[in-house]
């Protein structure tokens, strides 16, 4: 196997930090792989914030990691404040660091090109459910983009959302799909390649909406 998909709960950091040195997805992965007699090296293809829930794709070797990174497609569900028109939309706005902030990002003319495509599925009682495809992968992209149009994610107090109805940003990575790398034996090892689309075996993994986001929608929509 070249990859594994993990379903991360909210409030769990992906990597160890000064504030969260032990209880992380990376440490849990390493312990599980060691128990199975496999390499404990954690190679996440995508990363999600500590309070974001959902799928994290990890490569099981260093050869597969860049191939998977180039062809993975992700779908997120976000509950945003305010009622947006039903249907499809695009937020295409550059994102950069907030001045004098280590964590915060913002839409700024000198930021990196950033594009989020979304579909508003439901909108009622002051909330909207959006299915989001981050075409680019900037830090906090979905959070920053919706905040920039006046509709921050519910619970996202870093970008103007309110925590009276949910205790974290209402964002969940619900689906990932990727083409499985092919390999060819060569002298001294193997060569991994991303197959052309018409010959590819595509894997799609889905994660249901977590309980706190379901409760938010059930209560308000």
Positions of the model-derived regions?
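Short histidine-centered loop motifs in beta-beta connectors
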Residues: 125-126, 130-133
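Pseudouridine synthases involved in rRNA/tRNA modification
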Residues: 135, 143-221
């Amino acid at each position: 196997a070249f990859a594994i998909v993990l379903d991360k709960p909210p409030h769990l950091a992906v990597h160890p930090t000064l504030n969260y040195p032990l209880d992380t997805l990376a440490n849990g992965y390493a312990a599980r792989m060691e128990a199975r007699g496999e390499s404990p090296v954690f190679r996440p293809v995508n990363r999600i914030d500590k309070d974001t829930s959902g799928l994290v794709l990890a490569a099981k070797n260093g050869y597969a990691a860049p191939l998977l990174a180039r062809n993975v497609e992700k779908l997120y569900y976000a509950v945003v404040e305010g009622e947006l028109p039903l249907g499809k939309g695009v937020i295409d706005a550059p994102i950069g660091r907030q001045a004098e902030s280590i964590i915060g990002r913002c839409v700024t003319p000198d930021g990196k090109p950033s594009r989020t495509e979304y579909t508003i599925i439901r909108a009622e009682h002051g909330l909207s459910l959006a299915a989001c495809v981050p075409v680019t992968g900037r830090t906090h992209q979905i959070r920053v983009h919706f905040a920039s149009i006046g509709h921050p994610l519910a619970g996202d107090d870093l970008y103007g959302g309110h925590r009276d109805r949910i205790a974290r940003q209402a964002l969940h990575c619900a689906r990932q799909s990727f083409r499985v790398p092919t390999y060819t034996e060569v002298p001294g090892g193997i060569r991994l390649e991303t197959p052309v689309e018409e010959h590819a075996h595509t894997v799609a993994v889905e994660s249901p909406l977590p309980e706190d986001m379901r409760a938010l929608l059930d209560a308000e929509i």
